[in-house]
A protein has these predicted regions:
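Conserved blade-register residue in beta-propeller folds
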Residues: 48-50, 91, 141
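A short beta-strand motif characteristic of beta-propeller blades
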Residues: 8-12, 58-62, 100-105, 151-155
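A detector of repeated loop/turn-to-beta-strand junctions in beta-rich toroidal repeat architectures
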Residues: 7, 17, 41-45, 57, ...
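Conserved small/polar residues in nucleotide/adenosyl-binding loops
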Residues: 189-191
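Beta-propeller and closely related beta-sheet repeat lectin domains
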Residues: 18-22, 68-72, 111-115, 161-165
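Glycine-centered tight turns/hairpins at beta-strand boundaries that repeat
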Residues: 1, 26-41, 51, 75-85, ...
Length: 191
């Protein structure tokens, strides 16, 4: 991303879908779960692309269970997928591949939660608590290269879901898209 400019066509996914969740290594990008025209409740499919060249995605792996609207995290080796309407956290080793395996559980079932990571820890923040459908302010984390249940980290400055998140080696930002009343708010954590 060294220059400014408009986007260009990279390729196509293996299926028409929305509400999938993404994570990446330095060389590969992944899109897991999401709704398809034949299933509005999610899917188990995961597409993969190589960043180094344009081209269509390939079917790469299978989630343990049907998911949509989940938060993700990754480092250079593992990609994690959590939420999507359940407490299940699952992960994949991005190279060489294989299907997702069980990592542990979050404290409650979330959907539309947000995920981010440092090289060592994966975080989930906010979300819609299922089945109550109430906005969450929870922040939980896992140690990416181990397995186990998530650990309480703290709280977002405001409850919400369906937003965006991003992080680097030292900081993470959560933006809650759906909150009531609507606010202009970012939550900052030191990771």
């Amino acid at each position: 991303i060294s220059t400014f400019g408009n986007s260009a066509d990279f390729g196509d996914l293996t299926r028409v879908q929305n509400q999938g969740s993404s994570f990446a290594s330095r060389t590969r990008g992944f899109l897991a779960g999401g709704n398809t025209p034949s299933s509005q409740y999610g899917s188990t499919d995961t597409d993969m692309v190589f960043f180094s060249s344009t081209g269509d995605a390939v079917d790469f792996a299978t989630l343990i269970s049907i998911k949509k609207e989940a938060g993700c995290f990754s480092n250079a080796i593992r990609g994690g997928h959590n939420g999507g309407g359940a407490t299940t956290i699952q992960y994949i080793t991005m190279t060489p591949g294989g299907d997702f395996v069980d990592f542990g559980d979050t404290s409650v079932a979330y959907e539309q939660n947000m995920g981010l990571a440092s090289a060592t820890r994966g975080f989930t923040g906010g979300g819609n608590k299922v089945p109550a459908y109430s906005a969450a302010n929870n922040i939980e984390y896992v140690i990416i290269m181990t397995t186990g249940n998530s650990i309480d980290f703290g709280d977002l400055t405001i409850s919400g879901y369906g937003g965006s998140s991003g992080g680097n080696a030292t900081r993470g930002l959560f933006y809650n898209r759906y909150v009531s009343p609507a606010v202009n708010n970012l939550s900052l954590i030191h990771i």
